[in-house]
């Protein structure tokens, strides 16, 4: 598949994700669901940064492994925050269940597109 088709496909799916989030805000006249997107957008950053700064490929080096583990932990905590925030908002009464569901699905789609883009277009350096 050509790169142009990948970009067009990913951008159309990304537009659907943002549309769901915007609709969850606009239909119910409450803009709190827009805050739910922030953890989903920030979620890939810890893995990208820790992989970039982890330079050693020696499996015996513990420092780089700790850095990668910290990145994975931060990634997991951010994703859990993205799903827990709407639940908290619903329990407090800030948003409705439908708005929380739409914003979670939209945020998940946005996160999926960011992850797929990084997998498809980031060049992996191979050392021999």
UniProtKB/Swiss-Prot annotation:
Localization (cell): Endosome membrane; Golgi apparatus membrane
Membrane protein topology class: Multi-pass membrane protein
Entry keyword Lipid biosynthesis: no
The entry's keywords: Endosome, Golgi apparatus, Membrane, Protein transport, Transmembrane, Transmembrane helix, Transport
Main location: membrane
Keyword Iron in record: no
Segments on the Cytoplasmic side according to the record's topology features: 1-6, 51-72, 122-128
Residues in compartment: Lumenal: 28-29, 96-98
Highest taxon of source: Eukaryota
Family: Belongs to the OB-RGRP/VPS55 family.
Function: Involved in protein transport from endosomes to the vacuole.
Transmembrane segments: 7-27, 30-50, 73-95, 99-121
Pfam family, one: Vps55
This protein's name: Vacuolar protein sorting-associated protein 55
